[in-house]
């Protein structure tokens, strides 16, 4: 398996796991917020504000995963080393 194949697989798996965790976390956060509003409708403003801030924090995980995956794909610092090694092996 080549270096670039492994990079693509790592980026795909990393993004999948990052978004899976984000989706589960956001679902649990919204579930808890809806339960809180159903128990105390008067506090819906505070609950909504806190939930939005929490969702923004949770969403940052997906953004960080995307950035790391893009770095792995397009700005990999080991790309030159892998190309040199491939040229050496091919000779």
UniProtKB/Swiss-Prot annotation:
Transmembrane regions listed in the UniProt entry: 4-24, 53-73
GO MF annotation terms: lipid binding; proton-transporting ATP synthase activity, rotational mechanism
GO cellular component terms attached to this protein's record: plasma membrane; proton-transporting ATP synthase complex; proton-transporting two-sector ATPase complex, proton-transporting domain
Localization per Swiss-Prot or TrEMBL: Cell inner membrane
Site residues, Reversibly protonated during proton transport: 59
Origin: domain of life: Bacteria
Keywords: ATP synthesis, Cell inner membrane, Cell membrane, CF(0), Hydrogen ion transport, Ion transport, Lipid-binding, Membrane, Transmembrane, Transmembrane helix, Transport
This protein's record includes keyword Thylakoid: no
Topological relation to the membrane, as annotated: Multi-pass membrane protein
Described function: F(1)F(0) ATP synthase produces ATP from ADP in the presence of a proton or sodium gradient. F-type ATPases consist of two structural domains, F(1) containing the extramembraneous catalytic core and F(0) containing the membrane proton channel, linked together by a central stalk and a peripheral stalk. During catalysis, ATP synthesis in the catalytic domain of F(1) is coupled via a rotary mechanism of the central stalk subunits to proton translocation. Key component of the F(0) channel; it plays a direct role in translocation across the membrane. A homomeric c-ring of between 10-14 subunits forms the central stalk rotor element with the F(1) delta and epsilon subunits.
Family: Belongs to the ATPase C chain family.
Family annotation (NCBIfam families): ATP_synt_c
Subunit structure: F-type ATPases have 2 components, F(1) - the catalytic core - and F(0) - the membrane proton channel. F(1) has five subunits: alpha(3), beta(3), gamma(1), delta(1), epsilon(1). F(0) has three main subunits: a(1), b(2) and c(10-14). The alpha and beta chains form an alternating ring which encloses part of the gamma chain. F(1) is attached to F(0) by a central stalk formed by the gamma and epsilon chains, while a peripheral stalk is formed by the delta and b chains.
Name of this chain's protein: ATP synthase subunit c
Organism of this sequence: Geotalea daltonii (strain DSM 22248 / JCM 15807 / FRC-32) (Geobacter daltonii)
Gene that specifies this protein: atpE
């Amino acid at each position: 398996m080549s270096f670039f194949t492994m990079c693509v697989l790592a980026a795909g798996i990393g993004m999948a796991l990052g978004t899976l965790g984000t989706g589960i976390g956001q679902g649990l956060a919204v579930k808890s917020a809806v339960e809180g509003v159903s128990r105390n409708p008067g506090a819906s403003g505070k609950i909504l504000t806190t939930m939005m801030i929490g969702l923004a924090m949770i969403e940052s995980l997906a953004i960080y995963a995307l950035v790391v995956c893009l770095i792995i794909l397009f700005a990999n610092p080991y790309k030159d080393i892998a190309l040199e090694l491939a040229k050496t092996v091919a000779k």
